Swiss-Prot record:
Tree of life domain: Eukaryota
Protein name: ATP synthase subunit C lysine N-methyltransferase
Gene Ontology MF term list: protein-lysine N-methyltransferase activity
Species this chain originates from: Caenorhabditis elegans
Swiss-Prot/TrEMBL GO biological process terms: peptidyl-lysine trimethylation; positive regulation of proton-transporting ATP synthase activity, rotational mechanism; regulation of mitochondrial ATP synthesis coupled proton transport
Summary of the function given for this chain in its UniProt record: Mitochondrial protein-lysine N-methyltransferase that trimethylates ATP synthase subunit C. Trimethylation is required for proper incorporation of the C subunit into the ATP synthase complex and mitochondrial respiration.
E.C. designation(s): 2.1.1.-
Subcellular location: Mitochondrion
Amino acid sequence: MGMNTGLVIAGVAGATALAISAAAIPFVAPALRRVCIPYVPATTEQLANVSRALSLATSSNSNKKGTLIDLGSGDGRVVLQCAREGFNSTGVELNSILVAYSKYRSIREGLGKETRFMRKNIFKTDLNPYQTAVIFGAESLMGDLVPKLSEMRSNTNLLACRFPLPENDAWKLEHQIGEGIDAVWVYKRN
């Protein structure tokens, strides 16, 4: 093996390591934030519970096909499912790779007009235009989220998945669907 072959192998190995590191950064970076919210895809049971929760939350509305935002939308599966159920759905996610993947899936599944995905911090997102919000949060995040969620208008809905909101005056618990990690709490804004 000549000197040039060794340099080529070393260059390829270095470029591969750099590419893997660059691809991993959006998935590792959440661990470095004040509140760690790792990407964990929603399970089939969680998606079914979200669907049941949406039915309960919107059953009193004459127009079930309102606007919905998923705060921390990950790979977009909740946004896509909600769009299939007739909601004009938006996903907000910090991980640029997951945002790109969500946009790709949306187009591939023919839901590009019913969905929108943004790379944005949930705490810097205007929630006022939305009738329903979905959050798969971490327990440590839920208390910090209550003041942000107060931007939503009265009589709007919140689906908190995996962890409930702490007791507060702004949101009234209406239903709990499922148990444990698959649980969904349905709240109505006072």
